């Protein structure tokens, strides 16, 4: 299907329901799907979503509450250090999760290909939280966050925004929740989001290696 045809179909797709189903997750298809605002949410079958409205966060609009400041430098930050351990932690800390073995294997492949990335938080060399997602152009497509210690996921988002501020990124948060709104995220229409992706996904990120953003 031509890109223009897919774009038109997505504009008229269900707002709060799967756009289509697939039997498997394939790394190459995931990369293409993300550039059209699609993401997988459940497995067997895989459900693909493109919600309207869409929740995004502009890094320089992050809200940092006063009570968070004491946590910001409490944890050690590592980038792309142990992606597999982080995504597994995201699965294991949820009683019900769409992150199954196939999902982990596929996203780890995307990590080895340089598309998927992780920001990990450590305390005394123990992984206690973080966030992972895909970077395509100047968009960080957030997939999941995890927090074992107090406010670890919030610190991860604050640190991610701090790192991406100089590069004119947007962060795709997928679906609105109060936790994200509290941090400065907001909803935009699907049409506006897809137009942003047309521009941002075709730009250079501005850095060579994500992991080198922390020196």
UniProtKB/Swiss-Prot annotation:
Belongs to the L/F-transferase family. It is found in: Cytoplasm. InterPro entries: Acyl_CoA_acyltransferase, Leu/Phe-tRNA_Trfase, Leu/Phe-tRNA_Trfase_C, Leu/Phe-tRNA_Trfase_N. Transmembrane segments: none annotated. It comes from Campylobacter jejuni subsp. jejuni serotype O:2 (strain ATCC 700819 / NCTC 11168). One of its GO terms (cellular component) is cytoplasm. Its EC number is 2.3.2.6. This is Leucyl/phenylalanyl-tRNA--protein transferase. It catalyses: N-terminal L-lysyl-[protein] + L-leucyl-tRNA(Leu) = N-terminal L-leucyl-L-lysyl-[protein] + tRNA(Leu) + H(+); N-terminal L-arginyl-[protein] + L-leucyl-tRNA(Leu) = N-terminal L-leucyl-L-arginyl-[protein] + tRNA(Leu) + H(+); L-phenylalanyl-tRNA(Phe) + an N-terminal L-alpha-aminoacyl-[protein] = an N-terminal L-phenylalanyl-L-alpha-aminoacyl-[protein] + tRNA(Phe). The gene is aat. GO terms for molecular function: leucyl-tRNA--protein transferase activity. It comes from the Bacteria. Functions in the N-end rule pathway of protein degradation where it conjugates Leu, Phe and, less efficiently, Met from aminoacyl-tRNAs to the N-termini of proteins containing an N-terminal arginine or lysine. Keywords: Acyltransferase, Cytoplasm, Transferase. One of its GO terms (biological process) is protein catabolic process. Pfam families: Leu_Phe_trans (PF03588). The keyword Transferase applies.
């Amino acid at each position: 299907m031509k890109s223009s045809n897919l774009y038109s179909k997505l504009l008229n797709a269900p707002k709060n329901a799967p756009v289509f189903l697939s039997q498997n997750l394939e790394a190459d298809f995931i990369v293409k799907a993300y550039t059209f605002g699609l993401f997988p949410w459940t497995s067997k079958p895989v459900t693909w979503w493109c919600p309207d409205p869409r929740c995004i966060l502009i890094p320089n609009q992050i809200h940092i509450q006063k009570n968070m400041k004491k946590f910001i430098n409490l944890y050690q930050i590592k980038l792309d250090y142990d992606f597999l351990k982080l995504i597994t932690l995201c699965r294991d800390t949820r009683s019900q999760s769409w992150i199954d073995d196939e999902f982990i294997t596929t996203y780890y492949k995307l990590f080895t290909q340089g598309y998927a990335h992780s920001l990990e938080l450590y305390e005394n060399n123990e992984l206690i939280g973080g966030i992972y997602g895909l970077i395509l152009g100047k968009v960080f497509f957030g997939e999941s966050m995890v927090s074992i210690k107090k406010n670890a996921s919030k610190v991860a988002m604050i640190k991610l925004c701090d790192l991406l501020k100089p590069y004119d990124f947007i962060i795709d948060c997928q679906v609105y929740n109060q936790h994200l709104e509290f941090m400065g995220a907001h909803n935009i229409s699907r049409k506006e989001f897809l137009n942003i992706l047309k521009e941002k996904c075709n730009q250079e990120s501005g850095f060579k290696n994500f992991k080198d953003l922390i020196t």
